[in-house]
Amino acid sequence: MNDQTFMKLMQVLPKSALSTVVGMATRLPVPAPVHQAAMRAFAKAYNVDMEEAEHSFEHYPTFAQFFTRGLKPGLRPVDAGEKVVVSPVDGRVSQVGYSDYGRCLQAKGIEYTVDELLGDSEAAKPFYGGAWTTIYLSPRDYHRIHAPLGGTITGYAYIPGEFWPVNPASVKNKQSLFCVNERLVTYLDTVAGKCAVVKVGATCVSRIKAAYDEVTTHTGQPGKVHRYGSAMPVEKGGELGRFEMGSTVILLFEPKRVTWDDSLQEEAVVRLGKRIGVIT
């Protein structure tokens, strides 16, 4: 199927309803033999490395728990360098750069604004001209999201939206894809200034859950912006949330505060806790 045909199909497909149904199915307990056979088939199809998983297949009673599985302790050591920025996830770099007057690159010839992404022009202003990167999490990847630097969680924004796929065809053809899909933004104050960790939903990514509060997306609730009155500390590498299936994370920093490593290029594979940049 070519990209144009795929996009036309996605245009008419009831993506939100499909994601709801898939999400419900992943949370349903089913007979263990059937469930374990399905998980094993999924792991084989997507080349999931269960040697890295905290537990074996038998430990996960639902697909949702399998998707959000933890890693074996110590498997992803976090670079403790004082000025080191670490990857918040396991994934592959889709784009990376420094925003040009608040504009970021989605794909060749397609840009979006930080204002659109965060849904709040005031919240977006501090990130104009700053470092940003987009990291894609495939179905085989570890689906939890962590802090790239230590600091405090200052608030979050839940922005309801659509459920377009975030595969290459959509990224190359859907204008402002990451700004129309549902997302959950976590705001941090770090040693490198303000940081936004944007978790973007997608088709069949039924929910995004925060680790620091009772926040779950795609539950029929309206959008919400919340600022914490007291500091909520988070260490570098501390868990911020999780996807029920893979999707995309976008990091935003203030200008002249973070410089990306030369190795952080488009299509580069990144691992949680590994260095991707430095504080300047």
Curated annotation (Swiss-Prot):
<keyword id="KW-0594">Phospholipid biosynthesis</keyword>
<keyword id="KW-1208">Phospholipid metabolism</keyword>
<protein>
    <recommendedName>
        <fullName>Phosphatidylserine decarboxylase proenzyme</fullName>
        <ecNumber>4.1.1.65</ecNumber>
    </recommendedName>
</protein>
<keyword id="KW-0443">Lipid metabolism</keyword>
<feature type="modified residue" description="Pyruvic acid (Ser); by autocatalysis">
    <location>
        <position position="247"/>
    </location>
</feature>
<keyword id="KW-0444">Lipid biosynthesis</keyword>
<comment type="subunit">
    <text>Heterodimer of a large membrane-associated beta subunit and a small pyruvoyl-containing alpha subunit.</text>
</comment>
<keyword id="KW-0456">Lyase</keyword>
<keyword id="KW-0210">Decarboxylase</keyword>
<comment type="function">
    <text>Catalyzes the formation of phosphatidylethanolamine (PtdEtn) from phosphatidylserine (PtdSer).</text>
</comment>
<dbReference type="GO" id="GO:0004609">
    <property type="term" value="F:phosphatidylserine decarboxylase activity"/>
</dbReference>
<feature type="active site" description="Charge relay system; for autoendoproteolytic cleavage activity">
    <location>
        <position position="146"/>
    </location>
</feature>
<dbReference type="InterPro" id="IPR003817">
    <property type="entry name" value="PS_Dcarbxylase"/>
</dbReference>
<feature type="active site" description="Charge relay system; for autoendoproteolytic cleavage activity">
    <location>
        <position position="247"/>
    </location>
</feature>
<feature type="site" description="Cleavage (non-hydrolytic); by autocatalysis">
    <location>
        <begin position="246"/>
        <end position="247"/>
    </location>
</feature>
<dbReference type="InterPro" id="IPR033178">
    <property type="entry name" value="PSD_type1_pro"/>
</dbReference>
<comment type="pathway">
    <text>Phospholipid metabolism; phosphatidylethanolamine biosynthesis; phosphatidylethanolamine from CDP-diacylglycerol: step 2/2.</text>
</comment>
<dbReference type="GO" id="GO:0005886">
    <property type="term" value="C:plasma membrane"/>
</dbReference>
<keyword id="KW-1003">Cell membrane</keyword>
<feature type="active site" description="Schiff-base intermediate with substrate; via pyruvic acid; for decarboxylase activity">
    <location>
        <position position="247"/>
    </location>
</feature>
<feature type="active site" description="Charge relay system; for autoendoproteolytic cleavage activity">
    <location>
        <position position="90"/>
    </location>
</feature>
<dbReference type="InterPro" id="IPR033177">
    <property type="entry name" value="PSD-B"/>
</dbReference>
<keyword id="KW-0472">Membrane</keyword>
<comment type="similarity">
    <text>Belongs to the phosphatidylserine decarboxylase family. PSD-B subfamily. Prokaryotic type I sub-subfamily.</text>
</comment>
<dbReference type="Pfam" id="PF02666">
    <property type="entry name" value="PS_Dcarbxylase"/>
</dbReference>
<keyword id="KW-0865">Zymogen</keyword>
<dbReference type="GO" id="GO:0006646">
    <property type="term" value="P:phosphatidylethanolamine biosynthetic process"/>
</dbReference>
<keyword id="KW-0670">Pyruvate</keyword>
